[in-house]
Design a protein with these regions (language model features):
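Catalytic phosphate/metal-binding cores of nucleic-acid and nucleotide-processing enzymes, i.e., regions
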Residues: 1, 71, 75-77, 81, ...
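A short acidic, amphipathic alpha-helical/loop segment
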Residues: 1-5, 100-103
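Short, conserved loop/helix-junction motifs that constitute active-site signature segments
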Residues: 6-9, 39-41, 109-110
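A general structural motif
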Residues: 10, 82-84, 113, 166
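Hydrophobic targeting segments
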Residues: 11-15
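Active-site-proximal specificity loops/subdomain of glycosyltransferases
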Residues: 18-89, 98-102, 232-258
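Conserved catalytic core of nucleotide-sugar-dependent glycosyltransferases
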Residues: 94-200
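C-terminal accessory extensions appended to soluble enzyme cores
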Residues: 164-260
């Protein structure tokens, strides 16, 4: 979805992956193992592998591992450039909208350039549930660099000092088509305190996804049902609606999961 949305408007996709989760568990190198599926995008992808073993052995702080993943990814993947460039950093599920990037690329940018923080339209489980207390998620950073500039290692952490740009990206959290992927995320991500049996229960997960309930019982967190036909969607989701129906409608008895 991300590659389709941005392919015509970016110079290079820098993608970092590791064979360990942030909590230190073995995982597949998904992009490497499925490389042929993305053949049409190969000429604009630079993939690097991050060795998290030293980081994981060094500390029990899973957030340190997450920072290492981001920082090492930028350090290893960023090519030598002979001219100024814009660097966008984000998680995989934070997708800039193509028309914003198209506009940004056509602009005469001021020097010095004030870094941007793209505020994503924030959805949960599918594009049918909008995060109600916080409809925007502070995700993508946009920074400008010259060839001799040293790239800071805290672009993600310092993003709240950037200029906010609202509704310029998508963030669809837990928009998975397999229930086992939900369980895998719970077992793998940095919030290890949430990895408890209740949140792995199949009936519980399906109920949350079908009815827009918070998976983790967090106080004040709720989701608002929205009309899919009245919102903006990523381009590939628009043209392949049947393929991505789980991102559009979770009301079926299996909540759109292909493995249930």
């Amino acid at each position: 979805i991300r590659l389709y949305e941005l392919y015509d408007y970016v110079t290079l996709f820098l993608i970092a992956e590791s064979n360990l989760t942030l909590s230190g568990k073995p995982k597949s190198l998904y992009l490497k193992e499925n490389w042929s599926r993305f053949a049409r995008y190969h000429n604009k992808i630079r993939r690097v592998e991050i060795d998290l073993m030293n980081s994981i052995n060094k500390t029990k702080d899973v957030w340190y591992n997450e920072r290492t993943m981001r920082d090492e990814g930028i350090r290893l993947a960023l090519p030598d450039s002979k001219k100024d460039f814009l660097l966008l950093t984000s998680d995989l599920d934070e997708i800039p909208k193509f028309h914003f990037i198209q506009t940004l690329a056509s602009c005469q940018l001021h020097t010095p350039f004030q870094s941007l923080l793209l505020q994503c339209d924030f959805y949960y489980y599918s594009f049918g549930f909008r995060h109600a207390p916080d409809p925007y998620f502070p995700g993508v950073t946009v920074s400008r660099f010259s060839p001799n500039d040293k790239i800071p290692l805290n672009l993600r952490e310092s993003r709240f000092h950037n200029r906010p740009m609202f509704s310029t990206c998508f963030h669809c959290s837990y928009c998975f088509d397999h229930l086992e992927t939900v369980r895998l995320k719970i077992a793998s991500f940095s919030h290890t305190e949430l990895n408890i049996p209740k949140y792995h229960d199949q009936k519980y997960i399906i109920d949350c996804f079908r009815n827009g309930k918070d998976l983790y019982d967090r106080h004040g967190v709720r989701f608002r049902h929205v009309n899919i036909n009245e919102i903006e969607l990523p381009r590939l989701v628009q043209v392949k609606r049947e393929r991505f129906m789980y991102m559009l409608d979770r009301s079926s008895p299996n909540a759109g999961f292909r493995d249930v």
